[in-house]
């Protein structure tokens, strides 16, 4: 009996140290977000890439990646017209012969890096090809990078690009 109690005490004492799921060296803060749908991916945006990941700060940049898919009795949740005044948009895109759906598990901030964690579910297709986007919006902040974590694995880290207006202003005029 004493041996069993001693073993139980050891397991209870050591388990928090020995079985940590993922060591976190940075403090992370949960970030509120909203998901959006009803958009198609432009066939001019990275058309041959199997996956794409973007962080967008303005409507012009968004419009280069996505278009609105209109249908009758449309109930899609789209971005509001003035979204980019207060929000930024993050998107992950999967292309290929599978319909991919997403479930966001969390969005957190670690210093100036946003971390978007989500899971995917794929339904293969014999003939049709798809470009399936995950689109979320969140409040603007002092962020410089976004890390995309898909199904528990770090997939990609991207920098926030300058807005389309800033790019146009920076380009030399002939």
Q: What label would you give each PLM region?
A:
Residues 1-4:
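Positively charged n-region of N-terminal signal peptides that target proteins for export
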Residues 7-15:
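Bacterial N-terminal signal peptides
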Residues 19-174:
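Exposed, flexible binding/inhibitory loops of compact, secreted disulfide-stabilized domains
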């Amino acid at each position: 009996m004493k041996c069993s109690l001693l073993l139980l005490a050891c397991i209870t004492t050591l388990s928090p140290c020995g079985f940590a799921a993922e060591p976190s060296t940075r403090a992370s803060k949960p970030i509120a977000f909203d998901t959006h749908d009803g958009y198609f991916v432009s066939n001019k945006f990275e058309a041959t890439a199997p996956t794409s990941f973007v962080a967008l700060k303005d409507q012009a940049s968004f419009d280069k990646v996505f278009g609105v898919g209109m249908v009758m009795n449309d109930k899609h949740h789209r971005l509001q017209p003035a979204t980019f005044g207060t929000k930024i948009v993050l998107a992950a895109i999967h292309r290929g012969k599978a319909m991919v759906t997403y479930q966001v598990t969390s969005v957190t901030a670690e210093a100036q890096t946003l971390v978007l964690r989500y899971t995917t579910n794929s339904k293969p297709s014999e003939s049709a090809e798809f470009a399936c986007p995950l689109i979320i919006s969140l409040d603007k902040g002092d962020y410089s990078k976004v890390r995309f974590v898909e199904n528990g694995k770090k997939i990609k880290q991207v920098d926030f690009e300058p807005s389309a207006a800033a790019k146009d202003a920076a380009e030399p005029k002939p």
